[in-house]
Regions:
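A structural signal for multi-pass alpha-helical bundles of membrane permease subunits
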Residues: 1-173
């Protein structure tokens, strides 16, 4: 248990590391995997962040051990306990993780600028940044771009609002 706490402390220290500090090694890794200019490279770095690991760890620690013991007494295997009991109870945590991951990936500007080197594929924040480049700025078009860029995030948050709130607070039903 002490080793797990040390590992978690190292993980929490990784949360303090700015993305710019790990951007070049990440780019080299994705280049060696031949994932530059792919949508996989955009999503892959957002999935396993230290925050997500901490969120799921805390939610798993709050899972009642009495339920697990009762399931073992009923004869369920560890896999059955995981799929029949753990995952359904953790739906709110999964909802919160999906919301945060989508918001981070959708609103990210720096990583797509680095990893998408072809002008054929750009993200919405990159498109909005392109709208304001030049000598004259059409603010109406720029605000429309910002609104369109914001809509998917707002819709997903509103749809998963209850799951997001329960998952962040660690509510277990």
């Amino acid at each position: 248990d002490k080793g797990k706490d040390i590992l978690m402390s190292i993980l929490l220290l990784a949360m303090m590391l700015p993305f710019v500090a790990i951007m070049i090694p990440l780019f080299k890794m994705f280049t060696s995997w031949k994932l530059v200019n792919t949508w996989i490279a955009l999503a892959l770095h957002s999935i396993s962040t230290p925050f997500m690991i901490m969120l799921f760890r805390q939610a798993a620690r709050s899972f009642p051990h009495d339920i697990i013991e009762a399931a073992r007494l009923e004869g369920l295997s560890e896999i059955q306990i995981f799929f029949r009991m753990f995952i359904p109870v953790m739906k709110s945590t999964y909802g919160a993780a999906m919301t945060v991951t989508f918001m981070n990936a959708w609103n990210n500007y720096l990583w797509p600028t680095i990893i998408l080197q072809d002008n054929k594929a750009i993200t919405m924040p990159m498109l909005v940044a392109n709208l304001k480049s030049g000598y004259s700025v059409d603010y109406g078009m720029l605000m429309l771009g910002v609104l369109i860029c914001t809509l998917p995030t707002a819709i997903i948050f509103l749809c998963l609002q209850k799951s997001f709130a329960n998952g962040i607070t660690g509510a277990v039903k």
